[in-house]
């Protein structure tokens, strides 16, 4: 009897241990599920097979058909930089526009000319050694960031303002600003308006989906003026409305207003740009987030135009610097520089050819040449877009 009782006690104890073990496993599993951070969606799923209790293998591969919840602006690693793709394809797909005088216009002959168009060429010259290896893609204002995010274009060079939201939520990475602008207002010369404060109870027309729209409303509120801010899809529609008397004033970046004024049907003298500038509009190229290699390549391509002007190097004299003894210029042009271990060409690891700056200057020009060709004829002055040494704010980091 005692033996049977002992056996029964041992059996009960064994069952208790098994139950405790099972309970412990469940609690541990619950704790693990609660404290393990969610898997980063940017990382590939673990494809290793787990072993089931019956000895078979269970496939733990994540469902690859699940929707991608990556938010705009969140970095997505694809494993290949746009720089590699551009160099493989031999062309830069540059998002721009074809109807903004001074910046980007498609001529009847099919040529893209203008300040922005030339900076597309600057990028191609730096990356590919061929300034004409550009596919110009005309993108609408409302679609420009979608085109950038979808991969339809490699870079956006379309008089686009660098803002916090575009840098964040829109998923763009802005590089070196190539034109510092500000918002202004243009009116008919015979309107009687001489200053922004004269504009009360008027209709101010802007392009929708731009910084201009919000800035105009904010400026009216700041000055206590009654403005009806009317938004149109593109500047061409504003011009039509302006000509039809549906707009009392036209607000945009001063550079854009200057461009449209230069081609206005009744002549530039029929329009006046009021003197006040009421916003900051840093314009420059943008690339997709998450690709630092491509961003730095585009960044240094733009900087090369600024540094070349500072060195006094332009498309007409670049060859004369072949024999320069200035090590800073030697490094910049991809020439050999004497060092402790002999002569060597600087390769800073940008993923660009060592002579990229020389290609930019030879094939397109320095910043001053690009500005003088496209923006000076509109009546725009360098102003703050002059070199830092000439009273402006353009400045290139040391190339070393």
PLM segments and residue spans:
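C-terminal motif of bacterial Sec signal peptides marking the signal peptidase cleavage site
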Residues: 18-21
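Bacterial lipoprotein signal-peptidase II cleavage site
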Residues: 23-32
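Immediate post-signal peptide segment of exported/extracytoplasmic ligand-binding proteins
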Residues: 44-45, 57, 61-109, 192-203
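Extended ligand-binding regions for polar small-molecule ligands
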Residues: 72-77, 121, 125, 189-193, ...
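Extracytoplasmic small-molecule ligand-binding "clamshell" domains
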Residues: 76-156, 348, 352, 367, ...
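Short helix-initiation/N-cap motifs at beta->coil->alpha
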Residues: 79-80, 134-146, 191, 229-244
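Bilobed "Venus flytrap"/periplasmic-binding protein-like clamshell domains
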Residues: 93-102, 112-127, 161-163, 181-240, ...
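Acidic, polar ligand-binding/catalytic clefts
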Residues: 121, 125, 129, 133-198, ...
């Amino acid at each position: 009897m005692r033996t049977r009782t002992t056996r029964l006690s041992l059996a009960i104890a064994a069952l208790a241990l098994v139950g405790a073990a099972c309970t412990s496993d469940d609690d541990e599993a619950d704790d693990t599920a609660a404290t393990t951070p969610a898997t980063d969606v940017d990382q590939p799923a673990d494809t290793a097979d787990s072993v089931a209790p019956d000895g078979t293998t269970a496939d733990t591969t994540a469902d690859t058909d699940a929707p991608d919840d990556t938010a705009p602006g969140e970095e997505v690693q694809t494993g290949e930089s746009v720089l590699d793709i551009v160099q493989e394809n031999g062309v830069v797909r540059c998002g721009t526009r074809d109807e903004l005088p001074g910046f980007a216009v498609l001529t009847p002959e099919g040529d893209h000319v203008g300040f922005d168009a030339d900076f597309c060429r600057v990028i191609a010259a730096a990356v590919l050694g061929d300034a004409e290896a550009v596919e110009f893609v005309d993108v609408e204002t409302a679609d420009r960031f979608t085109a950038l995010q979808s991969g339809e274009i490699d870079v956006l060079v379309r008089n686009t303002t660098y803002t916090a939201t575009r840098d964040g939520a829109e998923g763009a990475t802005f590089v070196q600003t190539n034109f510092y602008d500000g918002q202004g207002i243009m009116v008919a010369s015979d309107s009687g308006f001489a200053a922004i404060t004269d504009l009360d109870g008027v209709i101010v027309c802007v392009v929708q989906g731009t910084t201009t729209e919000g800035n105009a409303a904010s400026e009216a509120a700041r000055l206590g003026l009654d403005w009806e801010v009317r938004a149109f899809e593109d500047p061409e529609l504003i011009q039509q409305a302006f000509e039809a008397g549906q707009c009392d004033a036209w607000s945009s970046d001063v550079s854009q207003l200057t461009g449209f004024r230069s081609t206005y049907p009744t002549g530039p003298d029929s329009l006046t740009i009021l003197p006040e500038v009421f916003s900051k509009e840093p314009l420059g190229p943008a690339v997709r987030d998450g690709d630092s290699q491509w961003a730095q390549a585009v960044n240094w391509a733009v900087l090369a135009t600024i540094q070349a002007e500072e060195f006094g190097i332009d498309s007409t004299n670049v060859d004369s610097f072949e024999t320069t003894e200035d090590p800073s210029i030697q490094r910049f042009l991809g020439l050999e520089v004497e060092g402790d271990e002999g002569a060597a060409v600087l390769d800073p690891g940008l993923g660009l050819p060592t002579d990229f700056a020389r290609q930019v200057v030879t094939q397109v020009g320095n910043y001053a040449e690009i500005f003088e060709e496209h923006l000076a004829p509109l009546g725009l002055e360098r102003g703050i877009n002059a070199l830092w040494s000439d009273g402006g704010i353009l400045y290139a980091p040391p190339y070393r």
